[in-house]
């Protein structure tokens, strides 16, 4: 069995989060997947509603912990959820991820077969319209993918690779002592965990530009630590496999997002000691992806959207 651990804090957009959590719970009825919500209980009406509704599902468990802090700490909530994991494999999800459990099972089986020790799935961010047609079943996963590769604009925001959606062995989560709870608010706790996971299995190749922090619309133009992790995801991009992120409103002036600045500082302090003076011959993933296409006999024109 595969267990999904999902952090839940209802301080922000509680109605949207509860609705999406219920949709994930409903999806477990037809799949051999368990979901554990790491719930930061602020003892509001929304928290009581969430606990009551979600505990009614057979394959869903709400692992609540008291939360009297102003800050949202996804790392702590993931670690709380993991304490209840009993399966050999775990997937790191957020409540905004569409529950494509067939995709998640596919990559769990690849780990089980020894192909790779873990997988980081790319994530395609949907617009409000794209989210609506997927949720209302006016578009399937496959039809949305076809629209994306045909350069349709109105359904999509961008493709993130790497993303935080990771399938791994539960033993590895434990070995790494989970997520670093010094990260609070939004950002970088996932990159920190993924870098540590990657370095657990592979010899670190941290180049001079590792700390470059430049998010990118294209998965092939990423640099710095995103390139470092993104190289590991190239095979999945070739297979055109990715998860979908469902739309929600953002207010960049919220404390939750402002915390990114401090979180990046924590990330930088943790990883700067491993940086070498060596540089990549290509600071992006363009050349490597082209080489992958040639090696696999794939027509690069089938992936034109990745270069946009």
Q: Which ranges hold each PLM region?
A:
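Cell-envelope/extracellular polymer assembly enzymes that use nucleotide-activated donors
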Residues: 1-5, 34, 192
